[in-house]
Amino acid sequence: EHAHARGVDVVVTDHHECHGKLPDAAAVVNPRRPDCPYPFKELAGVGVVFKLLCAFETKRAGIPEQDAVRRICADYADLVAIGTIADVMPIRDENRLIVAFGLRRIEHSQRVGLCALIDAVGKRPDGSRSPRAQRITSGFIGYTLAPRINAAGRISSAGLAVELFLTDSREKADA
């Protein structure tokens, strides 16, 4: 409401059931809207944003949707997989594809903060940036990584987790 009152277009993304009036926004992207024909209703919030990014990339680059999905997956499938698992969404249909691809991306991740977090819990004992010593599984994400990521928001600020995923500094990630 604050941004809208100042003339800023707002796009709301969500994945929860819609109850009552939708927010006053330029767009409300939610597969669970009663008027939404999208067939898969069980995307996590991060999955909704992923689909929105794919649509933007298709339009922005003027490329076929499958090419846009490949580009966005290459950059973000790891984070979308973590978010989908952490949100305890059912791992079927689109979520299954996103998580399967994302887990493989995590195994070869160059994200400094994600590598530091995985190293901190002992999944990659040699500390190298080579492929993981063990396969990364949804169980590992759900029971080991996700609680640590969520703890930042409960103990201090969720911004700490965001900073961890965005940093290029191993020293900062290890702190």
Predicted segments with their positions:
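N-terminal small/polar loop signature for handling phosphorylated ligands or for N-terminal nucleophile
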Residues: 1-24, 28-31
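Short acidic, glycine/serine/threonine-rich loops at helix termini
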Residues: 1-2, 21-26, 40-42, 61, ...
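Alpha-helical scaffold elements adjacent to nucleotide-binding pockets in ATP/GTP-utilizing enzyme cores
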Residues: 2, 48-52, 101
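Glycine-rich loops and low-complexity Gly/Arg-rich segments
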Residues: 9-13, 35-38, 52-55, 169-172
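Short alpha-helices
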Residues: 24-65, 73-85
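Hydrophobic helix-and-loop "lid/oligomerization" segment in the mid-to-C-terminal part
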Residues: 58-175
